[in-house]
């Protein structure tokens, strides 16, 4: 009886604390928020001097953000569905409406809150964004007879502010199927091309500007200056965005979110994962445990280099896992690129989770995901951009994970990451290391991945990269690598007929990975590389050079 009375009193005490139930609320099954550290969460100091970019689905939206930031103004990409009230609360200095694949006269085309045009905030519309502005204010938008894509000559008719400091004509990049055929009342044309009369327009009283071309793309000459004019002459921004502030804000945010828990980071030795690891290590020190998974898909000498740099130089907790057999077993018989990526991503996470169980209080998985990683998989803001391919850092992961994600570089571009690496004190061999895909050499082998084919590719790639270094080109190009094709060709070596593999050389220039052009290498250099590969790598009798640009091709073959 005494026990029952005591139990009754305890239940009553709990009920007073939780009036709706005599039971303590269970935490089991509660969904934990995903942690994505980066500028969007660490931008308190920047919000009063920022530009909001409304994303209507353009593959170039992140390039707009990059152009703004390289002019030392903070930019945030938001959904086109953002309300005027939400924008008013953030009080940005200006708005940019991105391009997009839709047509403004389609019923299902994405639209923005019409209230944004009454806020008095300067607005720049690009391509679809320009057409949206024209339609809203009563102008007319029509479909072109033929889609205009590529370089066009832009003739500037007004140099007073938006085009201040530019010559009379420049090369611009066009990519559109619609055009503004007549301007709304109160708007004036600023520039034209031979086929587009209203290639740029303005309503200066409203501080609203629009361009049919893409100033954010490197193919537009002086495009960064056009963006700069909008930022400083129209929006009256101040130059305040720099990596020192980013480091301070992000380190503080990581400490706050992680607390006393531990973080596990998959370290590949590339600049992205390396910078992410060093940044997190600066925030939480020994609470970070890095894991290098030797999946058998890496280049020659990479494991040893990683040990030297991160154990020796940065004194990090670094574990090595030999999982070569697991990955090769998973890839046996697989030829589809998407299946390769997903299989490798899935196996990585399994390995990480197995290793993470050995670490006390681990709750977070760190990744070196960048802006281009996200846009190539799916729009970061849920906008209707077309999917290109599953990216190794985002799309290939299982939907259900036992660890929360920390992605401190998620909103940065590659050039910003390299600048960040310098300020964090990483060695030059990491800072200038060319991008290497998460699935490794598996997606540089067209067809099935086998130990024998991997070694052929490693040896050929080693020769090509070494010759690029000797020529003094390594730091000047974006990527240089070999691809092992799934075809064989007939050859003659000595007096015998051969039927062996083909290697493709790929060398591209780029500033961000979003667009790229093939490098015009010296034929003598190409000849030397070809001769060395054919003579030194067993199983190769032909070498070809890839002269495709992005777009329409991607940098990687798979």
Please describe what each predicted stretch is:
Residues 123-129:
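Conserved helicase ATPase motor motifs in RecA-like P-loop NTPase domains
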Residues 367-369:
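Extended catalytic-interface subdomain
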Residues 2-36, 40-94, 101-119, 131, ...:
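RNA-binding accessory domains that recognize and position tRNA/RNA substrates
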């Amino acid at each position: 009886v005494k026990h029952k009375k005591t139990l009754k009193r305890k239940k009553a005490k709990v009920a007073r604390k939780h009036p709706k139930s005599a039971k303590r609320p269970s935490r089991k099954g509660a969904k934990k928020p995903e942690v994505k550290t980066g500028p969007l969460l660490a931008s308190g100091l920047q919000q009063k001097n920022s530009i909001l970019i409304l994303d209507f689905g353009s593959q170039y939206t992140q390039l707009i953000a990059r152009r703004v930031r390289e002019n030392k103004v903070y930019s945030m990409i938001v959904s086109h569905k953002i309300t005027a009230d939400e924008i008013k609360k953030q009080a940005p200095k200006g708005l940019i409406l991105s391009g997009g694949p839709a047509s403004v006269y389609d019923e299902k085309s994405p639209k923005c809150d019409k209230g944004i045009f009454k806020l008095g905030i300067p607005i720049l519309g690009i391509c679809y964004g320009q057409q949206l502005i024209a339609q809203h204010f009563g102008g007319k938008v029509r479909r072109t007879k033929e889609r205009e894509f590529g370089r066009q000559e832009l003739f500037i008719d007004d140099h007073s502010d938006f085009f201040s400091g530019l010559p009379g004509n420049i090369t611009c990049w066009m990519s559109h199927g619609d055009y503004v055929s007549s301007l709304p009342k109160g708007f004036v044309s600023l520039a034209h091309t031979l086929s587009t009369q209203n290639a740029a327009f303005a309503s200066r009283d409203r501080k609203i500007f629009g361009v049919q071309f893409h100033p954010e793309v490197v193919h537009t000459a002086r495009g960064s200056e056009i963006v700069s004019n909008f930022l400083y002459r129209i929006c009256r921004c101040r130059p305040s965005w720099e990596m020192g502030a980013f480091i301070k804000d992000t380190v503080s945010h990581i400490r706050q979110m992680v607390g006393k828990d531990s973080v596990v980071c998959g370290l590949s030795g590339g600049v992205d994962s390396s910078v992410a690891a060093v940044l997190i290590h600066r925030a939480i020190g020994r609470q970070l445990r890095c894991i290098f998974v030797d999946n058998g898909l890496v280049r020659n000498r990479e494991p040893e280099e990683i040990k030297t740099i991160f154990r020796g130089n940065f004194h990090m907790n670094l574990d090595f896992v030999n999982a070569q057999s697991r990955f090769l077993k998973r890839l046996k018989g697989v030829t589809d690129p998407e299946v390769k990526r997903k299989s490798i991503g899935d196996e990585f996470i399994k390995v990480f989770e197995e290793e993470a169980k050995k670490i006390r209080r681990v709750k977070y998985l760190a990744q070196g995901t960048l802006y281009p990683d996200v846009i190539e998989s799916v729009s970061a803001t849920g906008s209707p951009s077309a999917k290109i391919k599953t990216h190794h850092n985002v799309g290939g992961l299982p939907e259900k994970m036992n660890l929360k994600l920390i992605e401190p570089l998620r909103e940065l571009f590659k050039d910003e990451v390299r600048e960040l690496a310098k300020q964090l004190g990483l060695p030059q061999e990491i800072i200038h290391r060319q991008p290497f895909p998460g699935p490794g050499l598996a997606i540089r082998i067209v067809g099935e991945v086998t130990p024998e084919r991997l070694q052929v590719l490693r040896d050929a790639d080693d020769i090509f990269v070494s010759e690029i270094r000797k020529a003094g080109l390594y730091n000047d190009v974006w990527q240089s690598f070999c691809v092992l094709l799934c075809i064989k060709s007939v050859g003659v070596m000595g007096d015998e007929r051969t039927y062996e593999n083909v290697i493709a050389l790929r060398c591209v220039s780029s500033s961000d990975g979003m667009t790229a052009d093939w490098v015009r290498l010296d034929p003598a250099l190409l000849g030397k590389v070809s001769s060395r590969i054919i003579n030194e790598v067993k199983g190769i009798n032909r070498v070809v050079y890839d002269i495709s640009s992005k777009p329409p091709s991607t940098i990687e073959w798979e």
